[in-house]
Every structure is written in C-alpha cells, then in structure tokens.
Amino acid sequence: TLKEQGKLEEAIEAYNKALAIKPDHASAQHIVSSLTGKTTTSAPRKYVENLFDGYAKKFEQSLVGNLEYKTPKMLTDVVVKEHGGGLLGSVLDLGCGTGLIGSEIKDFCTNLEGIDLSKEMLKLANAKNVYDQLSHSDIIEYLSNEELNFDYFISTDVFIYVGELSDVFRLIKWKNKRAGKLVFSTEHTELDGFQLEKTGRYSHSKTY
C-alpha cells in the first residue's frame, strides 16, 4: 500500500477520496487520523476486527517466528513474581488473540477466560484448549455487561488499539467483586497522555 511504501501524502489523499464516497468508513477515518497527527480516543471496532481477522492465520508466525515476540512470557513472569507464589486464581485475558499469553499463564490459574474482537483469532485460541471460556466481545462492552469476579486482568499489546483507558480502569475498579489487579503492556511515548501514531496504534506515557 501507499502507506507501507512511505508515501504518506499520497495515502492521505487516497483515503480522503474514499471518505468522500463513504464518509462513515471507520477504518479509513482511523488511518487518516493516524497519518495527519489527530489523536482519537480508540481505534474503531470494525478496523480492529478486520485487521486481525485478516492477520489471524499468520499472526503467530509473524510475531513469534519472525520477531521473536516475548511479551506474553515477560508479562506472565511479572504477574507470577508479583503474586509471590501459589496459584493466581481467576484470570481474564483482555484481548486474548490466538492465546499466546494464555498458553504461558494457564498452569498458574484456577480459571482462565479470554475475550477478543476477532472471531478468527478466537478460533485459534480455542484450538489451544487453555481457556475455560472464550467470548467474542469488545473490552468495554464486556466489562460493562458481564459479572466481573477475577483476581487478575491481563492484557498483552491490546491497549495499543485503545487510547483512552480511563473507562477500562473505572469499570474494573467499580464492578469487579474481588480486589483484582490489572497487568498490561503498552507502547511508550515521551509525550503526555497518549498519542495515535502513524502506525495506527496508540502509545502511552508512563505518567498516564
């Protein structure tokens, strides 16, 4: 694509032409925002669904095989060390994808559940047989509508598609029946708050 070739001005022009024809095209809106420096609160649901439905079959080979992706193992090690021994209890994987962190953390859980926007990713996660329950849902939708009774909420490279995280924090704090903990990874920015990058992903500052 023009974006992948680094032809950003041409890419913006092409996406704006698409928006002139279909103004409500969420994916095009998101990409134009990312390329023009406009920070929105989150990536549109349809954009994320389409991105990962299309990426699902080559996701693990791309990340684990080609990029030696280690975040799930690192995050699991952090949680287990912080917990200080024994089982973690009930864990909810927010944006479980193909189940990479589920495979790492399963043996430390009494109950492991996962949610994701991509049906294709969920199929691959289900095939691993590490989750006690999987749900096709948006994070805010799930946290708002479901009963929450978890010891840990984990999220691996998912908040890079959610800029404004205050609703996530608020819902977990207000609705969870236990004194649960949230452990997650983000991409870093030196700017205040959060920023939508040209990649279409969000970065967050440490202070945020």
Across the structure, where does each feature detected by a protein language model lie?
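Conserved SAM-binding loop and adjacent beta-strand
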Residues: 61-77
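Acceptor-substrate binding/catalytic loop of class I
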Residues: 193-208
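Conserved beta-strand signature within the Rossmann-like core of class I S-adenosyl-L-methionine
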Residues: 179-187
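Class I SAM-dependent methyltransferase SAM/SAH-binding core
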Residues: 92, 98-142
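A conserved beta-strand element that flanks and buttresses the S-adenosyl-L-methionine
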Residues: 154
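A short glycine-rich, Lys/Arg-flanked "PGG" loop and its adjoining helix->strand segment in the class I
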Residues: 166-179
